[in-house]
């Protein structure tokens, strides 16, 4: 639902089989309440996958046609807020992909934009790297509090956000994964 309400989403096509708890019509109605273009369909009601795909393409083309009529509004970098989400960590994450995201975040912040790094659970062992970048004492305390809360949770459930897939991808410890994740946050306050 939050994705439907996201300002960068102009319209949606909600697709279902008919047996889901969250029904596509309901999602479509939420989009309409947000004054966004929307359509929905059930694959089974359309007569199968091929027919549903064709119907979906028609609906998306209709939505795009209306979206193209939307007036463009200029904005500055100071209006831009971008967040990074985990993309699956392996041994290359801290060497390549996440480094690029971190450099992008630095440039975004330098131009007045806002970058959000939300993976505090994946920063286990590296809180000092984050707190030293805080813009003030209050921010430093908030980072420390959030980190401590995440660490307490990890200890309680005995799970430190490292998965079998991470190990299969070449990572060996949560600290190694954390280094790859934190580099994604860039280096700016």
Regions inferred by a protein language model and the residue ranges of each:
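Metallocofactor- and cofactor-centric catalytic cores in central/energy metabolism, strongly enriched
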Residues: 1-189
